[in-house]
C-alpha cells in the first residue's frame, strides 16, 4: 500500500510528487513484481501486491489517473466531505504558511470530481469529516468524525464508502474500535510495520524526494521493516508531533 498526497511539478513541498516521478515510481514497483490489487483485495492478499492511495483528495491527483489507468493500478482517494462541498482550501497547521502562497496547490476535489473518479473505476474513501487528530478527540466527537463522514460520502457519491484513512496516520486501540463500529470494512494507517488488524493496514508514505530507487527500497522487505513514514513526516514537520490545532477551512478566492 502506497500513500501519496498531491501530484505537482511546481509545488516544492514534501507532499507533492512530480507527475513524471510518479510514473517512474509506478513502473519501478511493477518491475519488482508487485501485482496491482484493489483496496479490498489488499486486506487478505498474500504475496506482493500494490494499491495506491491519495490522502486529502487534492485536485492535482487527477493528473495521476491516466498513468494509473495505463498501468492497470487501482487507487483509492480519501476525501473529507466538508471539502467536497466546494469553495474551500485545505488548511492545516503544518501547511498554513503556504495557504496564501500556493492556494491552487491546496485545492481539493468537489463532489462532481469525486463522482468522476467513481465513474473511471477508482474508489473514494473517508479521511474523516474535518481531518482532526483522532486520538485527541472525545468519544462522541470521534464517532461523529468517522460515522458522519462515511454517511455524507455515501449520500454524495451514491456508492458505499468502505474504507477509512486516518489523518496523519494517527490511530490507537480506541480509534480502531470506533472505526470498526462506524461501518467501515477496513482502515489504513501510515506506519511501515506489518499489522494483522484490518483497521490498521500499514501504508508506505511516498514523498517528493523519493525517486524510483528509493521507492524500490521502501517497498522491499527490508525497507518496510526499517521505515517509519510517520516519523519521517514528523521530522519534516516538527510541529506535527506536538500541535493539536484544529483544521481551518478557508474560502478559496475565485
Language-model regions, residue ranges each:
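Acidic (Asp/Glu)-rich catalytic clusters
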Residues: 30-32, 66-73, 109-125, 180
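Short histidine
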Residues: 104, 112, 215
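C-terminal active-site subregion of NodB/CE4 polysaccharide deacetylases
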Residues: 1-54, 58-63, 70, 75, ...
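Histidine-centered catalytic micro-motifs
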Residues: 2-6, 123-132
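Surface-exposed, active-site-proximal loop segments in enzymatic domains
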Residues: 47-50, 90-95, 134
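Short beta-alpha junction loops
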Residues: 81-84
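Aromatic- and acidic-residue-enriched segments that line the glycan-binding/catalytic groove
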Residues: 86-104
